[in-house]
């Protein structure tokens, strides 16, 4: 009994030592059928591959990613006499847009949606301004007159070409509180979703 017990232990020890000090198996540049011969390789196997062909999204023109828009100076009397003050135009320019198409015809689902993020003003269609000025908020409208709401997706804009300019208007609007002179600023983010 002792002889049978010690032989297997010795055998496994040799295999372990041999495995530690042996080179790579099979040798580099040689497959198992080459190493053992075709007739000795008997296992079956399967390789599964998968992937996806995608339409890349439009890219934003880098100079439009970070914009500083100077609203200028506005006399308090200009705001006292009306609901809104100065307006400034700005654009988000898209590049390298690819569309759903067949034979050069665009399908109706080639469009984008823009969401502006910022601190909500006194009403959902306005953005809060920081600084010393009081009684005013910021409002954003697209080229079709749709007003942006903080964190809400704006209506879809159909894409018609490889390069698109999404035009918007920023305006200073009264928020119903007492007007006070001073500086103001806001930092707004935006997200472009491509369909």
Curated annotation (Swiss-Prot):
It comes from the Bacteria. Residues 1-22 form the signal peptide. InterPro entries: Adhesion_dom_fimbrial_sf, Adhesion_dom_sf, Bact_Fimbrial_Adh_Pro. Transmembrane segments: none annotated. GO terms for cellular component: extracellular region; pilus. The keyword Signal applies. One of its GO terms (biological process) is cell adhesion involved in single-species biofilm formation. Disulfide bonds join 58-97. Its main location: secreted. Fimbriae (also called pili), polar filaments radiating from the surface of the bacterium to a length of 0.5-1.5 micrometers and numbering 100-300 per cell, enable bacteria to colonize the epithelium of specific host organs. Seems to anchor the pilus to the bacterial cell. In addition the stoichiometric relationship between PrsH and PrsA determines the pilus length. PANTHER family: FIMBRIAL SUBUNIT, FIMBRIAL SUBUNIT ELFA-RELATED. This is PRS fimbrial minor pilin protein.
């Amino acid at each position: 009994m002792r002889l049978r017990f010690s032989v297997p232990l010795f055998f496994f020890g040799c295999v372990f030592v041999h495995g530690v000090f042996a080179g790579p198996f099979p040798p580099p540049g040689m497959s198992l059928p080459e190493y053992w011969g075709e007739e000795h390789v008997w296992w079956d196997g399967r390789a599964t591959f998968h992937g996806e062909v995608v339409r890349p999204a439009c890219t934003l023109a880098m100079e439009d990613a970070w914009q500083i828009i100077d609203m200028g100076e506005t006399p308090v009397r200009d705001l006292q006499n009306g609901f809104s003050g100065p307006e400034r135009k700005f654009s988000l320019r898209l590049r390298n847009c690819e569309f759903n198409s067949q034979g050069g015809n665009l399908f109706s689902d080639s469009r984008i949606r823009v969401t502006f993020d910022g601190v909500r003003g006194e009403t959902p269609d306005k953005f809060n301004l920081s600084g010393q000025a009081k009684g005013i908020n910021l409002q954003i409208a697209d080229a079709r007159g749709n007003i942006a709401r903080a964190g809400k997706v704006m209506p879809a804009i159909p894409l018609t070409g490889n390069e698109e300019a999404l035009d918007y208007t920023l305006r200073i609007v009264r928020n119903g509180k007492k007007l006070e002179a001073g500086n103001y600023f806001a930092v707004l983010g935006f997200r472009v979703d491509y369909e």
